[in-house]
Amino acid sequence: QATGITEINVRDAIATYEMSLVTPSRFDRYLGGDRNALTAAEREGLTEFVNAGCTACHTGINIGGTMYQKMGLVQNYFQRRGTPLTDADNGRFNVTHAESDRHFFKVPTLRNVALTAPYFHDGAAATLDEAVRTMALVQLGRTLEPAQVQRIVTFLNALTGEIPAGARMPPNEGTPAAAPAAAPAAAPAAAQ
């Protein structure tokens, strides 16, 4: 018998929804001790991911999602992108209005990252390869060789999990389009 909106029903609905978000991957089996859950190439990619410094931000069971970081920690991401700044580029500043939060964004989880292109808050990276190269450069100050990028991408693909039966994928509305290749002539952005 339905009882309407109650604290218990809301709690149960949220718990049921959160259970649908769990998408176990082969990486979880690997973490659980199944050494063969990842291929040799995926294990090499994991090693490359760690050695490149990606785990400085992408940590924990969700491989990210636990902290905020400045976009362009080592190299100015926005200058490199080459398009005018937008309000969205201000990141956490838009919420806190603290200057120290300008250009800070929540580090995303990398689970199912192969399914979530385009990448970054502005959709500027169309592929995982491009996202890995850009992050290595602007966040870590590293230029990765193509083989290193490919190894990391191979590992990232292993983070794709199984979508639970009955789960519905969210609508694709609101996904940012890739940033324009050239800056429009009107309204130059203020330097940050």
Report each predicted region and the residues it spans:
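Periplasmic c-type cytochrome electron-transfer domains
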Residues: 1-192
